[in-house]
């Protein structure tokens, strides 16, 4: 019966949505249709079609009142059950607080005591929470570069080798990067699940603070580069791990560290193939690739792309003027 009754709902809803004047306008359209397309008003006496309309609307009105009454009853019953359950829980917890002590307190006072006890227990858990990294994190900590094959790489000795994500794996957290953003992962080795309100996380344009309330922050310092705070986000994953995404403002530089107090990684050892360089548009990608090439050439003491361009022009000029002697010329 319900399915049969609502079979025209979609059609009528579509028509009703086009009536910005609401129900009066919608009813006016229905009456207009009956006037123009049927003999509803002229095929019978006015008293007859008025009675028909009243019968239909009275029937639907009674159904609406009955349905609304049933909904109110169901809601009140649900609220009573909920209230009874809460009273039972409060009573049980009051008894648990002090089995040997009779307390003459109100429900509100009992609720306040329970909340205070829960807050204390939660804070005790947080205060006793260890900051030890997981074993897997310790095993994968980034190692310093102790040996180089090229003389030009001597300046990289002592710096940390980038991890597979072009970032760094430290004792308490891991970060990776592309030219566009930094991904930070902070696992908490706890025996209980964290909640978002247990955390203190602040992302500034040039600063980052991450930690558990009541404890020394795990990270609290100046970022290596500036970030867009409105595009940077964090999420608590599986109640154990904080994941933070920082959106770089300068998308043409690799970060050598997350915060200035961190050990430095060797940006010369970064593998751009593992970054999202392919996601950049053609013009930006060409510019970044040229910049990275010139940076490597300068570090190796070799000519940059601009230097090569000048050398090519000079060679062509020499070929066009063989009569000229360039052997005693010095070029910068």
From Swiss-Prot:
- Residues in CS domain copies: 168-259
List the keywords (alphabetical): Chaperone, Cytoplasm, mRNA transport, Phosphoprotein, Transport
The alphabetized list of GO BP terms reads: mRNA transport; nuclear migration; nucleus localization; positive regulation of dendrite morphogenesis; protein folding
Q: Where do the record's region annotations for Disordered lie?
A: 122-161
Q: What is one term from the GO cellular component aspect held by the record? A: cytosol
Loss of this gene results in the following: RNAi-mediated knockdown results in multipolar Class I dendritic arborizing neurons forming a bipolar morphology. Dendritic arborization is unaffected.
* A UniProt-annotated Pfam family: CS
Q: Output the Gene Ontology terms for molecular function.
A: unfolded protein binding
Where's it found, cell-wise?
Cytoplasm
Q: What does this protein do?
A: Chaperone protein with functions in nuclear localization and cytoplasmic mRNA trafficking. In postmitotic neurons, acts with nudE downstream of dar1 to ensure correct positioning of the nuclei in primary dendrites and as a consequence, is required for determining multipolar neuron morphology. Stabilizes PCID2 in the cytoplasm and thereby is required for promoting cytoplasmic mRNA trafficking.
What family does this chain come from, according to its entry?
Answer: Belongs to the nudC family.
Subunit architecture: Interacts with PCID2.
Q: PANTHER family, from UniProt? A: NUCLEAR MIGRATION PROTEIN NUDC, NUCLEAR MOVEMENT PROTEIN NUDC
Q: Can you say what this protein is called?
A: Nuclear migration protein nudC
